[in-house]
Amino acid sequence: MAVFKVFFQHNKDEVIVRENTNTIYVEGETEEQVRRYLKDRNYNIEFITKLEGAHLEYEKEHSDHFNVENAQ
């Protein structure tokens, strides 16, 4: 399992504006699994990145909302 950081807008109809970008963390096997997990939400997904090593540790320590959802 890996942790993915998902950058998104709350509404698929919104134009992507960096200042309105939200993030969530999702644990899954692949990016495709994470996308399937989120498909029923009305999110306009900008980008998904896999977090590993020092990057993952940094997010755990410095994110105010590091709560991981499970895509299983």
Curated annotation (Swiss-Prot):
Gene3D superfamilies: RNAP, epsilon subunit-like (3.10.20.730). This is DNA-directed RNA polymerase subunit epsilon. It comes from Staphylococcus haemolyticus (strain JCSC1435). A non-essential component of RNA polymerase (RNAP). Its EC number is 2.7.7.6. Belongs to the RNA polymerase subunit epsilon family. It comes from the Bacteria. GO terms for biological process: DNA-templated transcription. One of its GO terms (molecular function) is DNA-directed RNA polymerase activity. GO terms for cellular component: DNA-directed RNA polymerase complex. It catalyses: RNA(n) + a ribonucleoside 5'-triphosphate = RNA(n+1) + diphosphate. Keywords: DNA-directed RNA polymerase, Nucleotidyltransferase, Transcription, Transferase. The lineage of its organism: Bacteria, Bacillati, Bacillota, Bacilli, Bacillales. InterPro entries: RpoY. RNAP is composed of a core of 2 alpha, a beta and a beta' subunit. The core is associated with a delta subunit, and at least one of epsilon or omega. When a sigma factor is associated with the core the holoenzyme is formed, which can initiate transcription. It is an enzyme of class 2 (transferase). HAMAP family: RNApol_bact_RpoY. The gene is rpoY. Disulfide bonds: none annotated.
